[in-house]
From Swiss-Prot:
A GO CC term attached to the entry: myosin complex
Gene for this chain: Myo1a
IQ domain location: 697-719, 720-742, 743-772
Chain intervals for the UniProt region annotation (Actin-binding): 571-593
Residues involved in ATP binding: 101-108
GO biological-process terms attached to the record: cell projection organization; microvillus assembly; sensory perception of sound; vesicle localization
TH1 domain segment(s): 858-1042
InterPro entries named in the record: IQ_motif_EF-hand-BS, Kinesin_motor_dom_sf, Myosin_head_motor_dom-like, Myosin_TH1, MYSc_Myo1, P-loop_NTPase
Stated name of the protein: Unconventional myosin-Ia
Length: 1043
């Protein structure tokens, strides 16, 4: 936090004064209105949904929060994620992050932020980055297939997700495991008014190209499909087409093959097309109502996509086979029953497809069994729901939220207070509501609502939703958290909001009225065996794999567990998993029901604060201790801080802890010694201990390094000394041997030479063999002298362009002749350069630069070679009015020329004056005396020019340039070679970078309205000067004809 920036309100509610419900809500409102959406209760983060993107996320903030402790910066979800990650890495303790709140409170976004933070701060490397990318890319896939727009949330999770991210001992991710809970598959066939089906259906229709839609036999119009709510086909702020492409990319990153992606989309399309199967009454001779399919083409297309005969598929939808002993009886279904079978098939296909996708993701991100790993769990599960019509789905969703609230109560409120009591720490009890009685009402194994629902589903006889409700009224009419019409009548209460087919439970979040209609069917979740067997016969590989029970060889008459039992067991496993980890809480709050930014509804927030138990949590944290740990692990971690306990301590663990803390300057109020644990009141004290430990570790590391280096140097010295003595002895002996050998060889050699010399001296006068060598040397020297004198007389002129050179008279002098020619030419060039003025040097450099840029590329370049670069073509030096265009720019004007600017809208040209200085490009109307456009050379990203005889060029500006808000500029100049050459040199001098000069007939320019493709073509040859004709070809193309 910047030093001069004060906090808005109270950042940690533990410090709130006075502490009551009203001040708590006002503090949250004050922070929310100032866009401070995060608030602490100790190490619990309260997150308010801002319903807008705030500039408080990204790499910059991640880097900031990873370098500071929890309370040193503003409250943020990154701070909690950092604490959880560091605890997992440093303390070797598995973590879980529990994200709770109502639907629409921002839980899904919070889980994404946690995962993105962990992915950013953990290790690097090719394999690690691949794992991180797969974990992150699982989110868009699961959101597409498991999220939908509801009345209260445009991106509501309609399933529960718990992800275990697994790390190695260094804190680098190895992979993960995703567990999903109770997909709301009834949404596949029916949605409430104002809601949508799952996102993937709309994304597929909006984002698939025409070829893919044709292959899937789909139409782009959502109103065509019976399973899609045509009234709400689009959601504000959500681009279904781009999201579809993102889902395809994410599936590829995770590891889905192209074939698997295609099969997933085919099965998704099948679900859509099943909703368009029209069923009609058919006449039978026996008078029994029957049904048939009136759209033969539609069922035939579905059969082709499944790889089934359409007749067989129709039979499975319109009839049912009943097995009685060894006999099979086929009964026809009426239209209502057939529609139920069709919808059940669609729901089961989609639900099993979703489970298959989760399983497939887990196969890609799973970790090998042999690796030791640490685990961080992230729970993103549907929020508490209170709708106008609450059914079985809302019942199990709210049951799950009750269990999560129970976890929070037991681990933060109840467990903490009981721990103080066990440890003998003085404590003032804080009252709170324990929702265990509600959980027991729902999940009791024998007398719970779920148990009664299963019993009703399994018992013989006539079973209906009303008999189930009657059983509940019989058992729970006197329960304090259960209400129904029967219990109200018995107590002479009159409530018109309570229907005859409804019951009400007083949840921790408020009272919810449930309509029992459909409870029995949804709990049974039955799919006729004929449909399973028919799907197993399908030739579509993915569809067939979704229905293994359809295999006649593996058919089982055992009744599958009910949906309620499956969900109850899954929640029990989840609770066991959460209890085994250290919890970190994010409590999400929805500020208003209209999803509007900046709007704070105090009553709504107060209700959520009450059932989340925020006030009780503050009181417990305020009266308690922020950190506690057993004496033994605490001593193991911090014993190095005291000389009494380091390096060895053989006494009692508690006594050792007292020695450690006694050696530090800590207040006695900050510490409390329990029976088995040490309690520390303030997080700042814990941070102080960690800082002292870090400094002590540095000291110990230095000490270890010092001792090791000393030992290594002593050992090395001893080895070197021993080796040196041995080497010296061998070396001296060998040196003497070699010295004696050399002396002896030298003596013998000298004797031989002396004898030879004496012999040659005595007998030289008798031999003439030396005369030939003397004559040869004389002749060769004479030829060389003649060659050099002749070359001196016939030297060519000192003109640089004169490349003549006399030939060598003999072949033996060819190499020397070539080298002399090279040296003479270099000498001529140096003489020529020494005679040039600075202006002539600059002119030649410009010509050289033009040659490098345009020679062999631009057709008009040869004509520009003999013409000197003038620079001023408008008489700038003699015109004070034009000189004012230069403004305060210092230095000379490199180019002053009249150019034509091409209009972005219609391609017409208009005259402009262009000035090029050492720092800017200035454009103005020829009739005005003030600069209209001033572009810094650092904003010029490049230029594009054609290879023809024209003078058209595009001035490309960097995207971050603020000089021209309308984008790039198209200009026409009669001196394009000179202008671009000098601009290239000016950019190089001003920015130390080379300007990109592209010579091409096709290039793209960026205008405010978007990119425009410019194409330059050669028209029929015209007389006189070259003419350019610019024409717009639609909104995204322009054609320039050179005549």
């Amino acid at each position: 936090m910047p030093l001069l920036e004060g906090p808005v309100g109270v950042e940690d509610l533990i410090l709130l004064e006075p502490l009551d419900e009203e001040s708590l809500i006002k503090n949250l409102q004050l922070r929310y209105e100032n866009k401070e959406i995060y608030t602490y209760i100790g190490n619990v983060v309260i997150s308010m949904n801002p319903y807008e993107q705030l500039p408080i996320y990204g790499p910059e903030f991640i880097a900031k929060y990873r370098d500071y402790t929890f309370y040193e910066l503003k409250p943020h979800i990154y701070a909690l994620a950092n604490v959880a990650y560091q605890s997992l890495k440093d303390r070797d303790r598995d973590q879980c992050i529990l994200i709770t709140g109502e639907s629409g409170a921002g839980k899904t976004e919070a889980s994404k932020l946690v995962m993105s933070y962990v992915a950013a701060v953990c290790g690097k490397g090719e394999q690690v980055n691949s794992v991180k990318e797969q974990l992150l890319q699982s989110n868009p896939v699961l959101e597409a297939f498991g999220n939908a727009k509801t009345i209260r949330n445009n991106n509501s999770s309609r399933f529960g997700k718990y992800m275990d991210i697994e790390f190695d001992f260094k804190g680098s991710p190895l992979g993960g495991v995703i567990t999903n809970y109770l997909l709301e598959k009834s949404r596949v066939v029916k949605q409430l008014k104002g809601e949508r089906n799952f996102h993937i259906f709309y994304q597929l229709l909006a984002g698939a190209d025409a070829q893919l839609l044709k292959a899937l036999k789909l139409e782009e119009d959502t109103s065509v499909y019976g399973y899609l709510n045509g009234e709400v086909s689009k959601v504000n702020g959500m681009d279904d087409a781009s999201n579809f492409r993102a889902v395809q990319h994410a599936m590829s990153v995770i590891g889905f093959s192209e074939e698997e992606i295609r099969q997933v989309l085919e099965v998704t399309a099948l679900v859509l097309k099943l909703g368009n199967v029209k069923l009609t009454d058919e006449f039978q001779a026996n008078g029994i109502p029957a049904s048939g399919i009136c759209d033969g083409k539609g069922i035939q297309e579905i059969g082709e996509m499944m790889g089934l005969n359409s007749t067989e598929l129709e039979r499975a939808l319109c009839s049912r086979t009943m097995e009685t002993g060894k006999e099979k009886v086929v009964t026809v279904l009426n239209v209502t029953q057939a529609q139920y079978a069709r919808d059940a098939l669609a729901k089961n296909i989609y639900s099993r497809l979703f489970d298959w996708i989760v399983k497939r993701i887990n196969e890609s991100i799973k970790v090998g069994t042999g690796e030791k790993k640490k685990v961080m769990g992230v729970l993103d599960i549907y929020g508490f729901e209170i709708l106008e019509d609450n059914s079985f789905e809302q019942f199990v969703i709210n049951y799950c939220n009750e269990r999560l609230q129970q976890v929070f109560i037991e681990l933060t409120l109840k467990e903490e207070q009981e721990e103080y009591k066990r440890e003998g720490i003085p404590w003032t009890k804080v009252e709170y509501f324990d929702n265990g009685i509600i959980c027991n009402l729902i999940e009791h194994s024998q007398r719970g609502i779920l148990a009664m629902l299963d019993e009703e589903c399994l018992r013989p006889g006539v079973v209906s939703d009303s008999t189930f409700l009657a059983k509940l009224n019989q058992l729970f009419s006197k329960h304090s958290h259960y209400e129904s019409k029967v219990s109200q009548n018995a107590q002479r209460q009159y409530d018109r909001t309570m229907g005859l087919s409804c019951f009400r439970i007083s949840h921790y979040a408020g009272k919810v009225t449930y309509n029992v209609t459909g409870f029995i069917d949804k709990n049974n979740d039955l799919l006729f065996r004929d449909l399973s067997q028919t799907m197993w016969k399908a030739q579509h590989p993915l569809l067939k794999s979704l229905f293994p029970e359809g295999n006649p060889k593996e058919a089982s008459l055992k009744r599958p567990p009910t949906a309620g039992t499956q969900f109850k067991n899954s929640v029990a496993v989840l609770m066991k998993n959460l209890y085994s980890k250290n919890p970190n809480y994010i409590r999400c709050i929805k500020p208003n029901d209209q999803q509007q930014k900046g709007r704070f509804t105090s009553e709504m927030v107060m209700v959520q604060a009450r059932y989340l138990g925020l006030l009780e949590n503050v009181r417990v944290r305020r009266a308690g201790y922020a950190f506690r740990q057993g004496y033994k692990p605490f001593l193991e971690r911090y014993r190095l801080l005291s000389r009494s306990t380091w390096p060895r301590w053989n006494g009692d663990d508690r006594e050792g802890v007292e020695k450690v803390l006694g050696s530090l300057t800590l207040s006695s109020e900050e510490l409390a010694y329990g029976k088995t644990k040490i309690f520390i009141r303030s997080p700042k004290t814990l941070f102080y201990l960690e800082e002292q430990r870090r400094l002590r570790l540095q000291q110990l590391a230095t000490l270890i390094q010092k001792v090791y280096r000393g030992w290594r140097c002593r050992t090395h010295y001893q080895q070197m000394r021993k080796s040196q003595i041995l080497i010296s002895a061998w070396f001296r002996g060998n040196k003497q041997k070699k010295h004696y050998g050399k002396i002896r060889s030298s003596v013998l050699l000298i004797q031989a030479f002396v004898r030879g010399w004496r012999a040659r001296k005595n007998y030289r006068k008798y031999f003439r063999s030396g005369a030939a060598l003397t004559l040869a040397n004389f002749i060769y020297q004479s030829m060389a002298q003649k060659f050099l004198l002749n070359l001196k007389k016939n030297l060519p002129s000192t003109k640089v362009l004169d490349n003549t050179w006399p030939a060598a008279p003999y072949r033996c002098f060819n190499t020397a002749n070539q080298e002399l020619q090279r040296l003479f030419y270099q000498w001529k060039c140096k003489k020529f350069r020494d005679q040039l003025s600075p202006k002539q040097v600059q002119t030649l450099r410009e010509k050289l630069c033009a040659s490098e840029l345009f020679k062999g590329k631009k057709a008009s370049y040869p004509q520009s070679v003999p013409i000197p670069f003038r620079g001023d073509y408008i008489g700038l030096q003699g015109n004070p009015k034009l000189q004012r265009l230069k403004g305060r720019e210092e230095g000379p004007v490199l180019v002053a020329d009249t150019v034509k600017k091409v209009n972005r809208g219609n391609g017409k040209t208009s005259a402009r004056i262009l000035l090029l200085t050492k720092g800017h490009v200035i454009l103005t109307d020829a009739k005005k005396s003030q600069a209209q456009i001033v572009i810094g050379l650092e904003d010029v990203a490049g230029v594009s020019v054609s290879s023809l005889q024209d003078g058209l060029f595009s001035l490309h500006l960097s995207e971050m340039s603020s000089a021209v808000s309308k984008g790039d500029i198209l200009l026409v100049s009669d001196h394009v070679v000179e202008l671009l050459t000098k601009m290239y040199q000016a950019v190089l001098d001003a920015t130390q970078r080379q300007l990109s000069v592209t010579v091409t007939e096709k290039f793209s320019v960026r205008f405010k309205e978007g990119s425009v493709a410019v194409k330059v073509i050669q028209g029929p040859e015209g007389g006189g000067n070259r003419k350019l004709i610019c024409k717009k070809k639609g909104s995204n193309a322009m054609e320039v004809t050179v005549r």
